[in-house]
Structures are given as structure tokens and as C-alpha cells.
């Protein structure tokens, strides 16, 4: 037999009812099944692109030309 909850148990049961709400359950995860993996893959792509761009960026010492500014009139 289950023991009656009493006022304290009833208070905590009511307080935690929001956790079982259908909108907060796995419904969103099932609605967008690949979103987490897609976001993670996109972040890896962005980091990889930044590393690639920094590795292939020409250093300032390899450029020997200087920019000429147009004279102001």
C-alpha cells in the first residue's frame, strides 16, 4: 500500500507538475531530430574555416608593396 502524501508531499508534487508538461518533454527533440548534430557540425566547420584562413593568410612581411594613399584635394 502506498503511504498518503500529506500536505508536504502534495505541495512538492504540485510544484513539480510543470516538469511533465508535454511541451517540455522530448517533443521538441523529436520534432527537430537532427538539429543538435547539425549545429555542432556547423560550429566545427566555422572553426575549421577560421584555422584554414589563418594558416593560408599571407604574412605582412611577405608583401613588399606599400599602399599609396590618394592625395586629398
Curated annotation (Swiss-Prot):
GO CC annotations, alphabetized: extracellular region; mitochondrial inner membrane; mitochondrial membrane; respiratory chain complex I
Superkingdom assignment: Eukaryota
Primary localization: mitochondrion
Keyword Cytoplasm listed: no
Transmembrane segments: 31-48
Keyword Transmembrane applies: yes
Sorted UniProt keywords: Electron transport, Membrane, Mitochondrion, Mitochondrion inner membrane, Respiratory chain, Transmembrane, Transmembrane helix, Transport
Membrane-topology descriptor: Single-pass membrane protein
GO biological process terms, semicolon-separated: electron transport chain; photorespiration
Location of the protein in the cell: Mitochondrion inner membrane
Subunit structure: Complex I is composed of at least 49 different subunits.
PANTHER family in the record: NADH DEHYDROGENASE [UBIQUINONE] 1 BETA SUBCOMPLEX SUBUNIT 3-B, NADH-UBIQUINONE OXIDOREDUCTASE B12 SUBUNIT
Protein function: Accessory subunit of the mitochondrial membrane respiratory chain NADH dehydrogenase (Complex I), that is believed not to be involved in catalysis. Complex I functions in the transfer of electrons from NADH to the respiratory chain. The immediate electron acceptor for the enzyme is believed to be ubiquinone.
Homology family: Belongs to the complex I NDUFB3 subunit family.
Name of the molecule in the record: NADH dehydrogenase [ubiquinone] 1 beta subcomplex subunit 3-B
Originating species: Arabidopsis thaliana (Mouse-ear cress)
Lineage, uppermost ranks: Eukaryota, Viridiplantae, Streptophyta, Embryophyta, Tracheophyta
